[in-house]
A protein has these predicted regions:
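Non-heme Fe(II) oxygenase catalytic core, chiefly the N-lobe of the double-stranded beta-helix
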Residues: 2-226, 231-265
Length: 265
């Protein structure tokens, strides 16, 4: 049985586990179940190297390949402007990654915490009639939307690089488990068939609702930490830090397990 402790009532659990048992996948099924139920799992003091981090990721599912700047599925995260705004990874692709595993290699002297918000719980707390209405809507997700604030004065080259990243997704993800979660965040450009002003207002309201303190866990990093989150049921963002600090995180992602299809698919 896993030794766990809830970090907040609605999101996040700390897991105390022997590194050898973790890498051997002894508790893999329990970890996957807990991850889906709690959204974020924190393991402290593991000091896993990149090979061990990959081995742990592989106990959760197939390691996702193909993102920019990756080495055998690993992404070295220094500073990606869009990550400072609430988002879900891979909303342009179907299926999006199931989970993400992150470990720090160099920490900034201040700032750089990572926050997570529970999109399952946020949906569950909406009135039933609003839940049903939102479940009829589709949203266009674009990299341009995600970069609007992160790159306030884009070049033509920026626009060209963003053009290929677009997807139409349901506003509410109906999971195979029967649960539903909101698909929102910085990549959400606009709601199909809705006036752009009404669309903006609704998306902003849902984001403010979902990122209330009661739905959020904020992780303050220490060397040796490993954090894994359910990318299909959470939003996340990095808090600001000194970009000259050399902060570096190593990341692996797990292939998606279920599609985020359009309503008409």
């Amino acid at each position: 049985v896993l030794n766990t402790r809830e970090l907040t009532p609605l999101i996040g659990s700390e897991v105390v586990i022997d590194p050898k048992a973790l890498l051997a996948g002894v508790h893999a099924d329990e970890i996957r179940e807990l991850l889906i139920r709690r959204g974020v799992l924190v393991m402290r003091g593991l000091d896993l190297d990149d090979g061990q981090l990959a081995a742990f990721t592989a106990t959760i599912g197939k390691i996702r390949q193909g993102a920019m700047h990756e080495e055998n599925g690993m992404l070295k995260v220094l500073s990606i402007p869009g990550t400072h705004f609430w988002h879900i990874d891979g909303t342009y692709t179907d299926p999006p990654p199931f989970a993400t595993v992150l470990a720090p290699r160099v920490l900034a002297p201040g700032g750089g915490d990572t926050e997570f918000a529970n999109t399952y719980a946020a949906f569950d707390d909406l009135p039933p009639d609003e839940q049903e209405y939102l479940s009829t809507l589709e949203v266009v997700h674009t990299m341009k939307a995600a970069m609007n604030y992160a790159v306030p004065e884009p070049t033509v080259e920026h626009f060209q690089s963003w053009q290929g990243h677009r997807g139409v997704r349901p506003l509410v993800w109906r999971h195979k488990s029967g649960r539903r979660s909101l698909v929102i965040g910085a990549t959400a450009s606009h709601i199909l068939g809705m006036h752009f002003a009404d669309s903006y207002e609704l998306l902003q309201r849902l984001l403010l609702h979902t990122t209330q303190d009661k739905y959020v866990y904020r992780h303050r990093w220490a060397l040796g930490d490993v954090v894994v989150w359910d990318n299909t049921g959470t939003l996340h963002r990095a808090r600001p830090f000194d970009l000259t600090s050399g902060r570096q995180m190593h990341r692996f992602a797990v292939e998606g397990l279920e599609p985020l299809a359009t309503l008409s698919a």
